[in-house]
Each structure stands twice: as C-alpha cells, then as structure tokens.
Amino acid sequence: GLKDINGVPIFQVGIGKTNAAMNMTEIILKEKPDLVVNFGSCGNLKKHKVGEIIEVGEVYNNIDVRPFAEYGCTPENNICEIKLSDSGIKCFSTDQIYDNTRVDYAHKYIEMIRECDIVDMECYPLGYVCKKYDIGFKSYKWVSDDGNVDTWEQNAAIGFQNFREHFLQTFFGEY
C-alpha cells in the first residue's frame, strides 16, 4: 500500500479499540510525532452521505463499568470525552456494531447512538493515547456506509482518495 502522502508517513493501526491503542502507542514511542492525523471509516448515524469526509469534533467512549465510573469513563483516568476540534461532529467509538433491528442494547448505549453523528471503533483510543503522550490529534472520517457492509470495500478506495485530496488541501494548501 501507500507509504506516505507528500512525505508524511502513513501507518495502519488496525481494526478495533485494542489494536488501535496498542499500535498507536508503539508508533508514538518509535516515531515521536508532534501531531497525529487519523483517517478512518465511520458509520453514519444522522445526516452524512457515503463518501463524505468529516472532521471529528468530540469523541465518546463506549465503556460501561458502573458503579466504578460513569458510563463512557474508564476508572482512574476519568477521561470521558475528548474534544478534538470545533467541527461540532460527535463520534461514538465502540467495538459493538450497531444494528437497528436488535432490541437488547443497554439504555446508555442507545442514548449515545442518538446523540452522536457518526460511529467508529478507533477514534477514542487513538485520541486517548495521544492525549496521554501530549501529542496533537486530529481525526477525519469518511462515511463508509449507512449499514450496508457489502459496499464497504468498494467505498474504501473512494474514501481514501477523497481524504488524500482533503489532507493535501488542509495541510499543504495544494490539491
């Protein structure tokens, strides 16, 4: 695959919270970046179109360890949400794929699905690791689907090309 965009290295952190956190930690310790720019897929929960590039404003974690901490917070670190930008887009990070035909979700999980604009698996752990190491973090998501996983791979190539153009324009002023 592609190794860089305009000399900026590209790293894959994997799918899911655990892989993302582990691999991001290893990358930070080895590369020592000042800024991490995340690009990944997300599911649409509200009004966004497939292929759209979205800058994440706030990211929330799906963890439920009550009574030790409130919903969305990990005990001992008390970081329940991470503000990334003023975009106003709320992202819910969860390893649980949302299926609107299920009825057995926890009440707080459903509240977050209703409150947030998009859902992903990796944004919160990546933001958390960067925050812990005092490294700047921006996250851009492309809307991969509206529940149709059969089109994900086809949409991935389009999403990456859209992100590449957005990245070059945003960070280098070129396209």
Regions picked out by a protein language model, each given a short descriptive name:
Residues 2-175:
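Glycine-rich phosphate- or other oxyanion-binding loops that anchor nucleotides, phosphorylated ligands
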